[in-house]
Amino acid sequence: MYARLDKDRLLVEVGQGRLVRRKLLLKWGTLAAAVIAGFVYLASFLWFAPGGEVENLNLVTQENREASMLVTTLEDGSVVYLAQESTLQYPEHFATDKREVNLQGEAFFDVAKNHEQTFLIETGKVRIEVLGTAFNVRSHEDDSFRLSVQRGRVKVSLKQGGQSVLVNAGETVTLQARQLQLSETGDSDEFRQYTKNIRFKDECLEDILRVVNAEAPTLQIQAASSVLNRRKLTIEFENNSPETVAELICWALSLKCSREGDKLILSE
């Protein structure tokens, strides 16, 4: 397998645990995978909560400078696809009553449902509140703002002026002349761009497989044990079939792959 992958110039080894980079334009629905981007650092910051309270939390900062989407699974199971030239900041552990993150730039959020823990996104001029849904956000320093909802419902509020709107699936809200404007989403396929070229940086195999499998329901990839699921991996996929994804993961982690019906099983 190595000889074939190496011949096609699909592998790059980096340090211990191989960094696998593949650029095959194989048609496979909406899935594409990619890795190696942005950097992550963990530090202690002052978190300014609504109401003026200050909390001292360990915040993680994800910064993406690459063209492909940087995919991160948060503590609650929510998945964030961070676009190029964008930054996401969130606490290492969420508070008991809320899940609050800060976004500068563009991202697609697939938020895990939890009615007891509201999910909040702080941007420059707008605050976004959700319980469980999927949507994209574009918020830039030039005051431009745009949010489209794929499923569920989102509440968007201006920080100055107090205007709020509820955005349902199939709707888009923009900020124009300091007012939130609601309209129908023009391109229903705009969400596909976030899953076509994705990468993972130091993510658990379990979280990687959850994202990958969501794009290929007819052929699922599974780890044979919980120990394997906890293995961390930096890897990139780009328009790869499930078989190729499994093959690349096996190469990166020195695993074996076997097929059992509609499942690809990864084992040591």
Positions of PLM-derived features:
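A short, acidic loop/turn at secondary-structure junctions
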Residues: 1-13
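A residue-level detector for the "anchor" residue at the start of short, highly conserved motifs
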Residues: 12-17, 22-31, 38-268
